[in-house]
C-alpha cells in the first residue's frame, strides 16, 4: 500500500534539497531516518519531517508496520520563486531570488491495495 506525504513551498531551493533526497532514495524507512538525523544540512530537517509524516499516514490510514516500510518514490520539484530587491551603490538595485521547493515522499510496505 502506497502512502504519500508532501511539503509544498519549502523555503529551500530544489537543488539543495535534492542533495539530501539522493542519500535516502530507495532505502528502508528506519535506515533513512537514521541517515537524515546525522546529515548536517537544513534540507535534511525538511525531508525528515515529510518522511515522518508519510510514516504516520501509513500507520494511521493503512495500518502499516514501520519496519517494513520502504521509500518507493521521493522527488523534489521547484516551487514559486519570491523576488526581492537589494539596494546597491549609486541608486542601483539587485534582484534577489528566494527559491522554494515542493518535497514529495511515497512510502510502501510492498503490499498491493487489492490484498486487503
Curated annotation (Swiss-Prot):
Matches recorded under PROSITE patterns: RIBOSOMAL_L22 (PS00464)
Keyword set includes rRNA-binding: yes
GO biological process, one term: translation
Family annotation (CDD domains): Ribosomal_L22
Annotated GO CC locations: cytosolic large ribosomal subunit
Listed GO MF terms: rRNA binding; structural constituent of ribosome
Subunit description: Part of the 50S ribosomal subunit.
Function: This protein binds specifically to 23S rRNA; its binding is stimulated by other ribosomal proteins, e.g. L4, L17, and L20. It is important during the early stages of 50S assembly. It makes multiple contacts with different domains of the 23S rRNA in the assembled 50S subunit and ribosome. The globular domain of the protein is located near the polypeptide exit tunnel on the outside of the subunit, while an extended beta-hairpin is found that lines the wall of the exit tunnel in the center of the 70S ribosome.
Family that this chain belongs to: Belongs to the universal ribosomal protein uL22 family.
Protein name: Large ribosomal subunit protein uL22
Organism: Hamiltonella defensa subsp. Acyrthosiphon pisum (strain 5AT)
